[in-house]
Amino acid sequence: MGEFFKDADGKMPYNGLRDEKIPDNLRIVTAEEALTYVENYDGYYYSIEIKDSGYLGFKAADILYKILSDMNLIERVIVASFNKDVILYLEENYPDLHRTAYNIEAAGLFFDAVFGIDRPEGYYKFDILQVPPDKYIVNMGTSKLINHAHKNNVAVQYWTINDTERMIFLNNIGADGIITDIPNVAYEVLRLQDKG
């Protein structure tokens, strides 16, 4: 949750919190602390994003890989980054890590889907496409894209979906995951839909 997070009532409870106004229970935890905490409950799968580019992104990748390796979590983590340099660094240094597509790769898969271009097995070097369905000029939230991705062993996850009708639509066309600011609402909506 960031400073601009909105709760169900549209309020932003963390907006403007600085210095001594930040309560102790809002301390930022380390990746290792967060993973250890969640691992106490169940064997979840994770999507972890590296925000930095360049040297800091590479250093973050190195640290993250060590944590994941030490905790035996490599197979249950997808690493994401908007930075092509970080993605290429991951691919070169940690080929056993699962990763998302960077923007040019995502566009390539999209156009392959639209034009029905079949690629050889292993052509796509990424395991998951994490995209907004309609933020760009093109609509990425289609069954055609999802079906093409699945045919090539690529999962499709959409962000940031806070509209319940959109959640249902994406679920119905085969989306593998939905990133949302309201996971409790998404859980209930999709759970009820799956029952119905």
What are these regions (language model features)?
Residues 47, 98-100, 157:
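Short, well-structured secondary-structure segments
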Residues 21, 109-196:
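C-terminal active-site rim and adjoining tail of enzyme catalytic domains
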Residues 1-88, 92-93, 125-152:
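Metal-dependent phosphodiesterase/phospholipase catalytic core, i.e.
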Residues 83, 95-98, 188:
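Active-site-proximal helices and loops of the catalytic beta/alpha 8
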Residues 101-109:
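Hydrophobic alpha-helical transmembrane segments of multi-pass integral membrane proteins
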Residues 25, 80-82, 101, 161, ...:
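Short beta-strand scaffold positions
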Residues 50, 103, 160:
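Short beta-strand/turn micro-motifs composed of small residues
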